[in-house]
Design a protein with these regions (language model features):
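A short, sequence-level motif marking secondary-structure junctions
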Residues: 53-54, 75
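Structural motif
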Residues: 61-65
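Residues forming well-ordered secondary-structure scaffolds
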Residues: 17-18, 56, 81
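Acidic/histidine-rich catalytic neighborhood of metal-dependent amide-processing enzymes
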Residues: 1-52, 112-122, 272
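Metal-dependent amide/peptide-bond hydrolase catalytic core
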Residues: 41-44, 66-272
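Hydrophobic core residues within well-ordered beta-strands of beta-rich domains
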Residues: 57-59, 138
Length: 272
């Protein structure tokens, strides 16, 4: 017999915090499961499914410089100011980290000047400064998407080292916030895709191949990855304009996806 637990989750764009609490039911179910099937839409192509998803976390860089009249910038006892230092850090992120396979890191907001304010929830802020005053403060926020926790930890260490190598009379601090874990492309996940693709072909719907992780965002299925032997995502209803106010479900995909999922469950039951 097969025991099936269905966990209904909301849009990950609006997940409650802390994630350990809002995803507790999903994590608890995964701890007692062998296989996780995710029914989120994938990249919109019914010929693909996800055996891996990159994790996603946020970061905030706060930089401080020595304020002075702009005519004195670069003096040995004054330095370059906070904005130049923030620019150095971002440039080094770009030059030293972008070669990492399947990694992306994006600065989404930047503010700088004599004084800045930033609302983390609304993602809005203000900056005050004068053209003839060396910037005292700079703030940058962004995200990182990595294919594994190993990669994420390695990149975080590199980013911290880059931030620590400050220009004279500047200093920086980078903070990382909680986020979605990665689902690595394990042998078990790839085997599950083979079974699913076989089902699809037997039904006359064609082969199913793996989505390139660069074309897929984070998803709730990743919270199961550390606990199950196999996981796959993108088995659900197709959609258009995902994560927008105009998002719609493509009902024409429902019969195909339903048949695939039903036969997949049957074959998994027979295999066990």
């Amino acid at each position: 017999a097969m025991d099936i637990t269905v966990v209904m989750t909301g849009d990950e764009e609006l997940s409650g915090r802390p994630l350990a609490l809002s995803k507790k039911a999903l994590i608890d179910a995964a701890k007692y499961a062998d296989i996780a099937l995710g029914f989120e839409n994938g990249d919109g192509n019914p010929a693909t499914a996800n055996v891996s998803r990159r994790g996603s976390i946020g970061w905030k860089l706060t930089v401080t410089g020595k304020p002075a009249h702009s005519s004195q910038i670069f003096r040995e006892d004054i330095g370059a100011g906070a904005i130049y230092e923030a620019a150095r850090i971002l440039t080094q992120f770009y030059t030293e980290l972008r070669q990492e396979d399947l990694l992306t890191f994006n600065p989404g907001n930047i503010l700088g000047g004599t004084k800045v304010t930033f609302d983390d929830q609304a993602k809005t802020g203000t900056a005050f400064g004068k053209d003839n005053i060396i910037a005292e403060t700079a703030l940058v926020t962004g995200d990182i998407r990595a294919i594994s926790e190993v990669q994420l930890n390695r990149v975080k260490t590199k980013m911290q080292a880059i931030v620590a190598a400050s220009y004279p009379h500047t200093s920086g601090v980078i903070e990382f916030s909680e986020g979605y874990p990665a689902m690595a492309p394990t042998a078990g996940n790839k085997r599950l895709l083979e079974i699913y693709s076989g089902v699809s072909q037997d039904l006359g719907f064609g082969e199913v191949t793996a989505v390139n992780p660069l074309r897929a965002g984070a998803a709730d299925v990743s919270f199961t990855a550390d606990y199950v032997d196999m996981a796959i995502d993108a088995l659900g209803l197709g959609s258009n304009k995902g994560h927008t106010a105009e998002e719609t479900g493509d009902l024409a995909t429902l019969p195909t996806q339903t048949k695939r999922a039903a036969i997949l469950l049957l074959r998994l039951q027979n295999a066990h």
